[in-house]
């Protein structure tokens, strides 16, 4: 929260994954986008809290990869609710900007599977059409299980997603963006190594690759 507050005067839009729904009141004036992670998307309190947001919110598919669970989460967040939040009875009107985020999946044996390919996106388009959801949209998380945490693969995956937008009008209409993990220095480090600008969690693209990839995305949107 301190980092978010200190950057509030900048022109950079800020996004955060919401781990704890009860903390929303502390950061709601600082964020322009909220993601609900794969391990939280099935939690009812996360779904209900998002229904009261006035910013775009992305629901990631669960680690199982189940599209129906993900879309049911979007359905819940897009509709109004009465529920107890931080000790108060509250009413929400629903968040029409709730959408899905595809982040790949993990099998019961621990193997990763991808869900950014053409056939996955077409299947998602069809499932969206079958449900009573407004503003059907998807963001593709190109790291996590989609890359198997091989962070350099993000570059290739982004190009594939952008190509699929070019060859299918349905995919182009639905896929609004990609989610990339990047930082100043590429890769990651263990806590205590103290390399400035290097991730201590998931491995990330470095500054140069991130910059070049943004230019590639811009070119492929033309």
Residues covered by each model-derived region:
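Solvent-exposed alpha-helices and their adjacent loops that cap or buttress functional pockets
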Residues: 6, 50-51, 90-94, 170-172
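General beta-strand structural signal in soluble alpha/beta enzymes
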Residues: 14-18, 57-61, 180
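Single conserved hydrophobic/aromatic residue that forms the stacking wall/gate
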Residues: 1-9, 13
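Conserved mixed alpha/beta catalytic, RNA-binding, or beta-rich assembly cores of soluble enzyme
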Residues: 52, 59, 64-159, 163
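Catalytic-face loop-and-helix region of soluble metabolic enzyme cores
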Residues: 105, 109, 133, 139-200, ...
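N-terminal active-site wall of soluble small-molecule enzyme domains
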Residues: 10, 18-26
């Amino acid at each position: 929260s301190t980092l978010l507050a200190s950057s509030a005067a900048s022109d950079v839009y800020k996004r955060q994954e919401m781990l704890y729904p009860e903390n929303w009141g502390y950061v709601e004036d600082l964020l322009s986008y909220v993601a609900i992670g794969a391990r939280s998307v099935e939690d009812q309190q996360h779904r209900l809290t998002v229904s009261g947001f006035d910013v775009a919110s992305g629901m990631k598919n669960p680690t199982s990869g189940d599209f129906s669970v993900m879309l049911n989460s979007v359905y819940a967040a897009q509709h109004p609710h009465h529920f107890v939040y931080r000790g108060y009875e509250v009413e929400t009107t629903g968040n029409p900007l709730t959408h899905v985020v595809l982040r790949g999946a993990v099998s019961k044996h621990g193997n990763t599977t991808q869900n950014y390919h053409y056939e996955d996106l077409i299947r998602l388009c069809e499932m969206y059409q079958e449900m009573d959801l407004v503003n059907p949209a998807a963001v593709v998380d190109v790291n996590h299980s989609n890359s198997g945490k091989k962070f350099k693969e993000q570059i290739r995956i982004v190009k594939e997603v952008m190509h699929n937008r070019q060859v299918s009008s349905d995919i182009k209409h639905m896929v609004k963006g990609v989610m990339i993990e990047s930082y100043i220095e590429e890769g990651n480090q263990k806590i205590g190594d103290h390399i400035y600008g290097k991730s201590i969690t998931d491995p990330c693209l470095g500054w140069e690759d991130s910059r070049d990839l943004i230019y590639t995305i811009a070119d492929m949107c033309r």
